[in-house]
Amino acid sequence: EYITARDLVTVPDLAREVWRTQMMSPERQRVSPFFLGGDTIIISYPTDTMTHEEKLMSLRGNNPHFSRAVVHHELIPGHHLQQFMLKRYRPYRSEFATPFWMEGWALYWEMLLWDLGFAETPEDKIGMLFWRKHRCARIIFSLNYHLKRMTPDECIEYLVDRVGHERNNATAEVRRSFAGSYGPLYQAAYMLGGLQIRQLHEELVQKGSWSNRQFHDAILQEHSMPIEMLRAKLLQLPLEADWQPTW
């Protein structure tokens, strides 16, 4: 309702209805300590296989203020609305999917909602700022790991000491970054893509004549592509046949 009341983006009625929730397995929580989104909100929370201390770390890491801060990243207008629209607009462009667009869009909304005053209480503001710090820390530890400047244990300590993560959650976060199929730039793509979309918003909406809704609808309907190419498409800039984006 916060999104639609401000006419920020079109949310089809069906998109509101078709998402669901399920509990994340204890095994998966070892690499995904926080809830995930898409057409299903997968809840990371204490299970009966955890020790008491592990349950407390899970509760603290998924407290209501931290979770409220990223619900729009995972659900609407984030990954759930993304996936809903991608199935309906230009699905052939899925071959050109990039995390700079996919994750950048979700993080862009975290920044925009902060600007719009979505965080109403000091606790909610801390929740949003915690995740902002987390996104930045991901860039630092993941790139340093791939450059062989940090070990996994050093990455865990970095998240505990510099971000304030619970140790179990920091360990799972590091596993997620390195044990899966993520490329070396995946974690950087959140922030870089988000900042690129933010800059495009400034150009077309804040300094241009586009409305928020027009801008956000256009991005979703163009499907996934490098943000520089998206800008060229939205501005109808001429492109040569061999043109390549710098990002």
Q: Residues of each region from the PLM?
A:
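Long, His/Glu/Asp-enriched segments that create or flank divalent metal/ion-associated functional microenvironments
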Residues: E1-W247
